[in-house]
Structure formats: C-alpha cells, structure tokens
A protein has these predicted regions:
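Polar/acidic, low-complexity leader/linker segments enriched in S/T/G and N/D
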Residues: 1-6
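N-terminal functional module of multi-domain proteins
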Residues: 12-115
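Residues that form generic nucleotide/phosphate-binding pockets
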Residues: 7-10, 146
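Alpha-helical bundle regulatory/interaction domains
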Residues: 80-83, 87-161
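Glycine-centered secondary-structure boundary/capping sites
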Residues: 9, 16, 75, 134-137, ...
Length: 161
C-alpha cells in the first residue's frame, strides 16, 4: 500500500490510472482537490497537492517512523494537534513533522493551496540509499531521533512572523 493511503482518508472519486505517477481526485462538501503521487525510491513518495477546499479527513493512526515534509507554494494550511498545539504553513513555508503526530483538525482556510509533500518511511529506506543520503549530509538516524522519537514538528518560515 502506498504511504499516502496511510496518512490521508481521501475517498477518491477517480484515479487517472493505477500506474505511477498516479493522480487521485476527490471532493467533499467544502470543495475538491487532487494529489499526484510519485514514488521516488523504496520508502519515499512525492505528492503534488492541488487543493480547492476547506478541509478533508486525515487517517486516524499514521505509521510510526514516517516523516512528512511539506512545502506550501501558494495558499495556507492549518492544523491542530490538540490542546495548546497548532501550526500553519503560508506561502513559502517549509515543515518537517512526524507523521505519527495525531492531528485533531486540519484545514485550508483560503480554500486554495498548492504545495508538495514528501513522505519518508525510515524503516523502508534501503541501506544503500541511507549511505547515499549520508554522503550528502542527511543523517536519517538523527532525524528519526529528533522528529519521530521526540514527536516534533519543525517549521521554517519564508518571512518573519
């Protein structure tokens, strides 16, 4: 099963094909959206998000050791992690979060969002790919400890808040 299916409860209306990359089109009472999913390598998927809706349901229990990297190109995304914990992404913002961090709600308040999501399943990335990433200075064990184990979300703003 593709990683995006474990994170998003999209109830797709139609799919362009079963081949990859794959585009999933969906809608609800607040609008419509689509995600184009592109597998990158074992344990990594890239999703192009084109949303014109207020909200959609997210899956209740995402997999552990999955990192969700988001970049907002246009629009705004907001989510709440429960009492006293929320975040938002505006145009140009970048976020790295543990996918296991349970969201109590999420929305696109402008009904307009374009961005990308990169999903990394740290348990599925091959030793060869890990060594290539380390060569570029990406330490997946350090990321796992900081993001997944500590259940953190790091946001880099394009402009000061």
């Amino acid at each position: 099963m593709a990683m995006y299916k474990s994170l998003f409860d999209l109830s797709p209306e139609q799919t362009a094909s079963t081949a990859m990359p794959r585009t999933v089109v969906f809608s609800n009472g607040t609008g419509s959206g689509s995600m184009t999913i592109c597998p990158l390598f074992s344990g990594a998927e890239l999703c192009y998000n084109d949303m014109h809706l207020v909200s959609f349901d997210e899956a209740p229990a995402p997999a552990r050791n999955v990192i969700e990297i988001n970049h907002c190109r246009v629009g705004r995304y907001e989510c709440s992690f429960g009492e006293n914990s929320c975040c938002y992404l505006a145009a140009g913002d970048f976020a790295v979060c543990a996918a296991a961090r349970k969201k109590s709600s999420s929305c696109f308040p402008l009904r307009h969002y374009h961005g990308i999501t990169i999903l990394l399943d740290l348990d599925a990335i091959s030793p060869e790919m890990r060594s290539r990433m380390e060569w570029y200075g990406v330490n997946l064990n350090a990321i796992r400890q900081y993001i997944c184990t500590e259940n953190r979300c790091c946001i880099l703003r394009s402009a000061p808040v």
